[in-house]
Every structure is written in structure tokens, then in C-alpha cells.
Amino acid sequence: DTTIRPLYPDTRPKVLMSDTVGFIKKLPHDLVASFKSTLDEAASASLLLFVVDASDPSFRSQLDVTRKVLAEVGATEVPSLLVLNKRDRLGPDELAALKAEYPDAFFLSTRNKEDLQALRERIMGYFESDMIDEELRIPFTAQGVVAEIRAKMRILSEDYDAEGLTIRVRSTPENLTAIKKKLAR
């Protein structure tokens, strides 16, 4: 079954991570249909992460199988990031060769907290690339929108004074437009 969890710690905007079962090369015929049905959501994903054990000599064929199955469910146009895990099990020459072969891949060891944080930042960087930073002035008479701002936008800074709140946010243009309309009322 597919597991869906928010990226932790919580992010604004919320990023949901969907973990599907791993790809198995010789899947029994009776499981193929149910397996593919769990992948239908991949076609509507914003970003696909291919997490692969870089120390497994057969990871390239596993990656090929993954890409073929995703093509079958119509997910070839979905942006993706190749994540090569278990870099701690590779020698320096192996790691250098893989970095040359997969220059856009993200290399990590899930045993290393800094690597996990860097992956989280890379994921957030993808989602924040289309966002803009803006400063909003919210008078005390319009404080009702603050909860919505906190729910949908990343707060960069906030300052209260005698007239209200000045808040600097990072958000999608759509969310900013909606909040500005509410503030203009």
C-alpha cells in the first residue's frame, strides 16, 4: 500500500510525501494490476523521487524498470529527482564514477542527519522555486487572515507595532493574490 505523510518538520506550503512499494522486477502476475493501481497517482505528482540503493550492483536495471512502469501509467512528464542512497557503502572511486554518470542525482546516506536535511532542503527548493517573497501589512482590523497566511505561506519574519502586523512571507503568487484581495476589503 501507498503511505502518504507530510514532509517533516512541517512545511509551508505543505509538501506531502507518498511512498509507494518498491519496484520488483518479477512481480507475480496476479499482483501486477494492483501494483500499477498504486502508481496511478504518480502521474499527478508534482515531483517524483527515485530512491535507489547505490550499493546494489543491479540498481541501474531497477531504475530502468521503474521508468518503464511510470511511462505505462503516464508519468514520464512529471519532474523527478534521482536519489542515490547508501553512499556510505561506496568507495571513493565508485562514488566519483556515479557522480560523473549521474551529475544531477542527489547522493546521501540515510544514516547521516545532515544528508537527510540537505535532501529536505533540495525538495523544498524545488517547490519554492516558483514562489516569491513579499512583505504584507496587516492592520489589527484584518487579523482574521493571519491564520490563513500561517497555514498556506512560509513566514520569514514578523513585527507587531501599534497599527498591526508587518509580515514577510514566501508564497505562491496565487496565494498572495488571494490574501491581498482579502486585505483590500
Name each model feature, range by range.
Residues 21-31, 51-59, 112:
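Flexible beta-alpha connector loops of hexameric P-loop NTPases
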Residues 25-26, 58-60, 89-93, 114-118, ...:
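Switch/connector loops and helix/strand junctions flanking conserved nucleotide-binding motifs
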Residues 1-26:
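Switch I (G2) and immediately adjacent beta-strands of P-loop GTPase domains
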Residues 132-185:
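NTP-binding/hydrolysis catalytic cores, primarily Walker-type P-loop NTPases
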Residues 1, 27-35, 87:
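A general structural motif
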Residues 76-81, 87-140, 144:
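Canonical P-loop GTPase G-domain recognition
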Residues 11-14, 35-107, 149:
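Conserved C-terminal guanine-recognition region of P-loop GTPase G domains, centered on the G4
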